[in-house]
């Protein structure tokens, strides 16, 4: 905040006359928002890189954007267009040197004669823009059947059944009897809702026990449960940027929207580094003093391409340059490691499986902050953070996304805890999922159907065109009774549209063969590009580029779960 205030006071003569305490009352987000609306400061921000994505220094620019501005009256010409938004009793505390006299009034006649803004037309135009660029999203009415996993029925016609191939219930825990029974028992005893926020009637044994289970899973001192991991990421990252003095974020270019928005809401400087590019990350870290607070935000499994972040190497760089690590394991918890703690645990598999000693500190111990979800491999809903006791307590005490929302229902938390404990005790589901993933990838490769190469459980089938991706999805559903959702912009870049396939333990070889045959039929009917076509064009996303990767799960590790 102090850095933003200093920069603002240098750039704008009206802000320069305002006390730092008054400016701080606006907060990072509001100050930046107000400045962006100003024709003077808005231009300055554009020139000086306030909103740049990577490595810019707002204080290094020298363009004098105020050269032609009359400052003799001491009143901001931009602010003078608006009526007071503060109570009259607080006029002395107006920011930007505003006064009641200087603010003036909106011309009454113009306001009465103006035409009302056409809101519905505006909404329609925004929707039409989505249709025009082929990124409009259609929702399929899919009702997953617990007793027939991975089958579902469409709409209200229960006989219209399809096989679901794109759900994030990776292990089928949403219908696991242990989870369902725990939820039934808790629901019958404690009712449907939590009754309030954690501070007001919503703190209960289920939250305490779930957070203890999560902390133990990641070998951290404490954990905190949120309504979703989107909220967990947004709330935590934004708080870090607001709380740490002169904080700088370092964000992987492929980070999830929840992390991007959390960083944006934090209001601190952001540096984007090329996806999984350690040399680029180090070069950008090296520009800042070691004493500057830094947050390196990245993921373990990137869900749209299946790539895996270099966790150990990023921890090395964090130690070298004085940063903390923020690791999103949303698509990895439950899926990797002997107990399902994620990729960080999996990288020290033997240590956690058999107690083998490592020559270095375990990677899980080196990660400062974990975030994860209860809504994917664990089959429930909710998100969480895990870290040091002091860090978690700070987030608990300051993060609006935690403080001002109703607690998850007791039954949901009981089910999530049951799922975590179940997956801690067995690897059979993870091994079955990995086995089916390899089977599908191998069969598609044999037919030349392009799969983005990766070492994880994600099977991204490259199409490369939004309209064709939707057509392929529709054809799979209507002709083959197979549901695979098309993935388009903004989830993936334009031109990299794909079908995202996620095998589960329930997708046995017979269902896998049906999927492969259906994809072959669709590729022929729509004349979609195969690996050889992408190779001739120079390749894309690793397809047709000679990229080979080894699965993260080794054959030896898979054998442990088959015993």
UniProtKB/Swiss-Prot annotation:
Residues that coordinate or bind substrate: 137, 251, 270, 491
Role: Catalyzes the synthesis of 5-aminolevulinate (ALA) from succinyl-CoA and glycine, the first and rate-limiting step in heme biosynthesis.
Keyword field contains Transit peptide: yes
Sequence positions bearing N6-(pyridoxal phosphate)lysine: 376
Biological processes annotated in GO: heme biosynthetic process; positive regulation of organelle assembly; protoporphyrinogen IX biosynthetic process
Protein source organism: Yarrowia lipolytica (strain CLIB 122 / E 150) (Yeast)
Cofactor requirement: pyridoxal 5'-phosphate
One protein family per Pfam: Aminotran_1_2
GO cellular component: mitochondrial matrix; mitochondrion
FT transit peptide: 1-18
Protein name: 5-aminolevulinate synthase, mitochondrial
Quaternary structure and interacting proteins, as annotated: Homodimer.
Disulfide linkage: none
Compartments where found: Mitochondrion matrix
GO molecular function, a single term: pyridoxal phosphate binding
Active site as annotated: 376
Pathway the protein acts in: Porphyrin-containing compound metabolism; protoporphyrin-IX biosynthesis; 5-aminolevulinate from glycine: step 1/1
Top EC category: transferase
Family: Belongs to the class-II pyridoxal-phosphate-dependent aminotransferase family.
Record-listed pyridoxal 5'-phosphate binding positions: 303, 331, 373, 405-406
Keyword vocabulary terms for this entry: Acyltransferase, Heme biosynthesis, Mitochondrion, Pyridoxal phosphate, Transferase, Transit peptide
Catalysed conversion reaction: succinyl-CoA + glycine + H(+) = 5-aminolevulinate + CO2 + CoA
EC number: 2.3.1.37
